[in-house]
Structure formats: structure tokens, C-alpha cells
Amino acid sequence: MKTITRNHYIQRINQVVNYINNHLNETIAVEKLAQTANLSPFHFCRIFKAITDESPIAFVARLRIETAAQLLRYSSLPIETIAFNIGYETPAALSKAFKLQYGFSPTQYRNDKEKYIVKQETIHPTLTLKVPKIVELAAKKVIYVSQKGAYGMVDYGRAYEQLWGVVKEQKLFTKGIESIGIFHDDPKITDVTLQRADVCLAVHKPAIPVGEVSCRTIAGGLYAVFSYQGSYDQLQAVCDAAMRWVVGSDYELRDEPLFEKYLNDARRTPAEKLKTEIYVPIQSVGR
């Protein structure tokens, strides 16, 4: 695809992905996704696969199974509720799809916290964190560039060049712009080639999507905020520790992705002095 054409389609596919994330509990028809992208169903399927390397049907199916795995590991929701919340008509349908994908049942996975869905060598060592702050956040408007692949290999430099270029072009500069990373997948569950990340700047003026840069809102609500100082290489271990805290707390995960806020400039700061806040969306158990 030519760059201009590809960027145009990226905007449309980003809208579709956001729609899918927000409607996993519903029947998701290809025709509806095509309508969201303002494309014919035939062309939509081809373009979606060209951008994401998956068909729409495969993408939705994978997201449902991986969301189920996350909820089984990190929430106390009954399997029946999980099944209905992510679009399965019956718990048996979820169990069949889960076992077909991973080789064991949802119940076996929930009861054995040592089970890994991806290869164990891809999982980082354990790490201990201080108790987080529990805060109520307002929603944040962000501009972002979506990237796919192993989280440690995300090209932050190129993404931030694009984002700051939009800030300059659209005169979005104000105090309080924040550098944020949104991570949609759990590396224990999703293959490294399919992990999705949004490199973001939180802005305080209305922005217009352009090129590969899209706009979205980070949901407000209750978050557990973990503070970490050190190399970004350890951030996955930090997130793992945050999830262990959730499992042992009086909270459970809310159906939103966690995000990281980067408090200093990695280009000018020694790795051991880099400061990051990890925001984990939570709610009281049984809410």
C-alpha cells in the first residue's frame, strides 16, 4: 500500500479494533465491523488482514479466548459469567474453545496458577513492589500510534516522533502532556508476534487523527498505581508483580487495559533512574 493509503486504512482499522474491544460480549458480525470501517465486507476483510495479519473472525476469536484467560487468572468471576461477558452463548462453548486453543479446560487453568499458556522462557522473573496507591482517575484523551509485537521491541522513538509532530502541527502543546503506554495483551497469554501496544501522549486540546496517529480515551475510574524506578527491561516483571498483588487483594481487574506513565525522558536519564507509574484498572470484588 502507498503510505497515504495505508495511513488512511490504519485509522479505519483502529476504529474497528476499539469497537471490538468494547463489544466482546455481543455478537460481532463482519458486516458491522465493515460498516464501522466504512468499507464493503469484501474489501474490509482483505484490508483488516493486511493491517493486522489476522482475519476479523480470527482476531475476535483470539481476543475472546485471551480475555477469558485473563479473567480466569485475575478475577473471581464464575466461568459462566466470564463466558457470557465475552460473547459465548454457553459456558460449554467457552470450555470447548479454550481446550481446543490451549489443551486444558478453563477450570484446570483457574485451579492451577502455575499453568502457562506461552513458553515459560518468555516470562520474566518475579519482583516485589511496594503497596500501590488506590486512586480515582478522570478519563484521559490521548493521541496514539498502535504497534504490534513483543512489548520490549516496540519502536517508541519512531512513535513519539510521529506524536510530537502532530502536537506541533495541530498546536496541541500545553502543560501536563503525559507519555503513556497502553498494553492490551498479557505476555503470559498472547504470542509475542501478536501483542498490541498503543504509544500515547495525553493531551488537553481537541486533536484530529492523521497518518498513523489516532485518538482515543483512556477510561476513568479506580486504579491501583504502582511506582517503579529502574530499567524499562524490568517493566514486564513489574506488571507481573502488580497482577500478583491484585490476586491477593480485595479488588479484581476492571475490563480495561493497564497502562504505564513514563515520568522522565529515557534519552537523557540513566536506566537505573527511570521512573514509571503502572496503572492497573480495578474494582471491588463482586461489583
What are these regions (language model features)?
Residues 5-9, 22, 37, 60:
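Residue-level marker of regulatory loop/turn positions in helix-turn-helix DNA-binding domains and
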Residues 22-26, 74:
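Short helix-capping/hinge SLiMs at alpha-helix to coil transitions
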Residues 27-29, 78:
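Residues at or immediately flanking beta-strands
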